[in-house]
């Protein structure tokens, strides 16, 4: 399904020419996405009895009740998950695994997620004169864990084109000429930046500004041409703005890839795929994700697409984003539904801020990883700093580890509400993004640096590159999640028209206590 969003191109064209809009652009409702349900049932590879026994075994081993666990193991009729069971035991600090146990495990299960750790332990336990144990297969253990950060690094590398070589010089020269009112020079610099751009984000940004400069410099016949260049990258900040300005479809696709008979056949034909399905059956999604993450690094294109479908189907949000981004890059095949998952986590007491904004922040901040931690000290799904978490805990009465999704979302939602209501923000989404990224005290400096009333120039005038890119990415996520949830995007209309985007609550489930005042 292509989500249809139409813009008022003539009105927006005038707004871009003048730098602000005197007209109000109405919101355009998106088509409601198709149902997420599927008639194809995930295969249950374990009998009900074995599924129950495996749950008990993992619990007993976590409690160091080895003999009780052994009795349950002896009663199993299917030993599919024994690699996980034995790895949990052998890696426990309360169990002394022998070299023979570790060597034999590696001989049978070198493709399992714990293989690298088991191999390292086996090397430590290897008696003199014994041959080295079998090695782990590439795509397990630390290699797979390292790939966990790949979506963030891909995005950073993509967007880093803003700061690379000739493209960066032309881009900065274009902005300087624009500020000085030298529009003919600005358009030439932006055109050069668009031609030199090495990423979709850089190309769409330069092309969009080239379109603006063409109007200002008296070349309206080139306006649509440069907007069309920007619009070729619909999953970027300026690409979405360009498509809204032109009044064309967003080209964001939310049809589920679907986990069906073919995907089931692919997954059940691979040991790691079978283990992942069995782990999903017993409710152990953490171990299932580890299996699928390792498999994705060594699997074929068909295997990777099957993993994307399974991750989307089973609500593995972090894995869904990670693998879908990898597939999009390597296979030029976008799965927008998988790249913009709707996780099941909720704040305590429910949502009081629209989910699109919360999900948009979460996708950028942690890629949906509850245990994400930044060297700066920020932690959890919404990357809360310790001081912020303590303050919001005092305001909400909710306490607990920020690695707990419900706790993190509850505290972060309160922080979002307080920022949006802050007199320095007053519902302005661009100011809000700055405040969330750098703290509300940073707003005074960035506001003073740009007083001409042009929201886009405000963004590009922010000296901190991380904050600029944060605004681009969070707003892009936010708009795409609006579409994912079947909602209009009035703030996209506003920004395309040269106006400041103001938060408007649209969720029926979000009784957001946000003031709706004029931006100051």
Indicate residue ranges for each PLM-predicted region:
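Alpha-helical segment of the N-proximal tetratricopeptide repeat
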Residues: 52-65, 146, 168-182, 270-287, ...
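N-terminal leader/linker segments that initiate helical-solenoid repeat arrays
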Residues: 28-76, 80-85, 133-154, 165, ...
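Catalytic glycan-binding domains that act on GlcNAc-containing polysaccharides
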Residues: 79-92, 96-115, 121-123, 134-139, ...
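Alpha-helical adaptor scaffolds
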Residues: 158-159, 166-198
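Bacterial N-terminal signal peptides
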Residues: 10-22
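Residue-level recognition of tetratricopeptide repeat
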Residues: 58, 91, 175, 209-212, ...
């Amino acid at each position: 399904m292509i989500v249809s969003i139409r813009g008022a191109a003539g009105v927006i064209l005038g707004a871009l020419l003048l730098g602000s809009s005197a007209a109000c652009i109405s919101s355009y409702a998106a088509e409601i996405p198709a149902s997420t349900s599927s008639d194809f049932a995930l295969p249950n590879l374990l009998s009900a009895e074995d599924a129950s026994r495996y749950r008990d075994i993992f619990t007993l081993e976590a409690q160091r009740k080895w003999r009780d666990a052994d009795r349950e193991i002896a009663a199993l009729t299917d030993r599919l998950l024994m690699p996980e069971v034995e790895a949990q035991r052998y890696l426990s600090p309360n169990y002394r695994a022998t070299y023979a146990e570790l060597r034999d495990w590696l001989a049978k299960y070198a493709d399992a997620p714990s293989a690298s750790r088991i191999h390292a332990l086996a090397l430590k336990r290897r008696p003199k004169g014994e041959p080295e144990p079998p090695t782990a297969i590439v795509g397990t253990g630390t290699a797979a864990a390292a790939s966990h950060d790949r979506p963030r690094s891909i995005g950073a590398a993509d967007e880093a084109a803003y700061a690379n070589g000739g493209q960066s010089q032309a881009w900065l020269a274009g902005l300087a000429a624009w500020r000085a009112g030298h529009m003919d020079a600005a358009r030439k610099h932006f055109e050069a930046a668009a031609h030199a751009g090495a990423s979709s984000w850089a190309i769409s940004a330069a092309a969009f500004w080239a379109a603006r400069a063409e109007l200002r410099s008296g070349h309206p016949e080139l306006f649509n041409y440069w907007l069309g260049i920007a619009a070729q990258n619909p999953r970027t900040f300026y690409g979405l703005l360009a498509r809204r300005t032109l009044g064309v479809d967003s080209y964001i696709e939310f049809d589920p890839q679907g986990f069906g008979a073919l995907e089931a056949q692919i997954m059940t034909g691979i040991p790691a795929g079978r283990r992942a399905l069995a782990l999903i059956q017993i409710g152990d999604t953490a171990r299932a994700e580890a299996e699928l993450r390792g498999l994705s690094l060594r699997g074929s294109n068909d295997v990777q697409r099957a993993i994307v479908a399974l991750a989307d189907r089973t609500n593995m949000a972090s894995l869904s984003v990670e693998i879908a981004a990898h597939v999009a890059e390597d296979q030029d095949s976008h799965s927008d539904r998988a790249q913009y998952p709707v996780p099941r986590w909720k704040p305590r007491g429910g949502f009081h801020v629209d989910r699109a904004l919360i999900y948009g922040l979460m996708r950028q901040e942690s890629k949906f990883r509850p245990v994400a931690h930044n060297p700066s000290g920020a932690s959890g799904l919404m990357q809360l700093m310790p001081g912020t978490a303590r303050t919001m805990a005092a305001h909400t009465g909710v306490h607990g580890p920020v690695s707990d999704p419900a706790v993190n979302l509850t505290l972060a939602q309160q922080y979002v509400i307080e920022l949006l209501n802050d007199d320095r923000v007053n519902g302005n989404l661009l100011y809000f993004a700055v405040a969330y990224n750098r703290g509300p005290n940073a707003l005074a400096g960035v506001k003073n640096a740009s007083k001409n009333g042009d929201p886009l120039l405000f963004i590009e005038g922010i000296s901190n590159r991380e904050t600029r890119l944060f605004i681009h990415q969070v707003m892009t996520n936010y708009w795409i999640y609006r579409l994912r949830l079947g909602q209009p995007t009035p703030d996209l209309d506003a920004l395309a028209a040269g106006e400041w985007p103001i938060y408007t609550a649209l969720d029926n489930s979000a009784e957001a206590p946000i003031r709706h005042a004029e931006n100051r």
